[in-house]
Amino acid sequence: FYWVGDGLYREKITTELEQFSNFKWLSRMKYPDEVKDFLSEIDIYALITGMDTAPLTLKEAQLMQKPVIATDVGGVNEMMENNQNGFLVKEGSSKDVIDKIKILINDKELSLKMGESGRIFVEEIFSWEIIAKKFLDSISNYIKNEK
């Protein structure tokens, strides 16, 4: 079990988890090489937060075909499809997080399917070409409506 990153709760969480021999806190990682290496090693990506609005790491994990478990806060629910490429969990529900982790650990086929689905989702929704086209369409519509 790896914990990556920092934040308001790091000290409280790491103090609690250090009692387990399979826990390792990796601190912050150098981008992009360490992040890519880390994502290639893990089986499940969990983004358990109360404050991220649209975390890039979520898309990175999906592009690496990792099933995602993420807290349903901010814009996270727009960055994935619940029960398709991962699971959204209620903020503060550790039981829900544990239940979803168990599902993915016990069902490798589902885990692989969700990982692949996440990659496809990000490529179809968040590619630079698609984002640029949507942006240009928005600007074009705005200009047309201003005349």
Give the residues covered by each predicted segment.
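Nucleotide-activated donor-binding/catalytic signature segment of Leloir-type glycosyltransferases, i.e.
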Residues: 12-29
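Short alpha-helical donor nucleotide-sugar binding micro-motif in glycosyltransferases
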Residues: 37-42
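A short alpha->beta transition loop at the rim of the catalytic pocket in nucleotide-sugar-dependent
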Residues: 43, 65
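Aromatic "clamp/platform" in nucleotide-sugar-dependent glycosyltransferases that forms part
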Residues: 50
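Short hydrophobic beta-strand element within catalytic cores of glycosyltransferases
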Residues: 67-70, 80
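A short, well-ordered alpha-helix in the C-terminal region of glycosyltransferases
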Residues: 96, 103, 110-124, 131-137
